[in-house]
Amino acid sequence: MNNANLTFFELISPHYERDNIKLGLSRLKKVLQEQGNPCNKIPAIQIIGTNGKGSIAAYLENILFEAKKNFGVTTSPHLFDICERIRVNKKNINKTDFEKIFVLIEKKFATYQLTPFEKIICCALNFFDHKQVELLILEAGLG
């Protein structure tokens, strides 16, 4: 399928994401290096495993919010809106910021053929870097 013929919504839809899984971190590492490794120096909690990742992320998010920390969270999949996947201090990224960052990453790094999930992670890390968060909660895309 040619990406040029897809709408923005189709590019980020769950069906498109499921059908375009490419395992490995090499593409993502290269893109993040070219972006100056956003968030590289920010401590992160990575949540992995088969079940309960979303629940653990929600618990941690509530604890950090009550502690008045400045933090970023990525989760997947979203329930209603793609912007749910990227949050700072319990607030979703707004659609304008998300689309601007997503389209920029898609155009600038088209040759890497990033998956939609990888593009969203790049968006999140760039957004968190811009917001100068002090801690990250990152839910793994696959167990």
What are these regions (language model features)?
Residues 25, 29-40, 65-143:
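ATP-dependent carboxylate-amine ligase catalytic core
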Residues 51-53, 78-79:
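Short active-site-proximal "capping" loops at secondary-structure junctions
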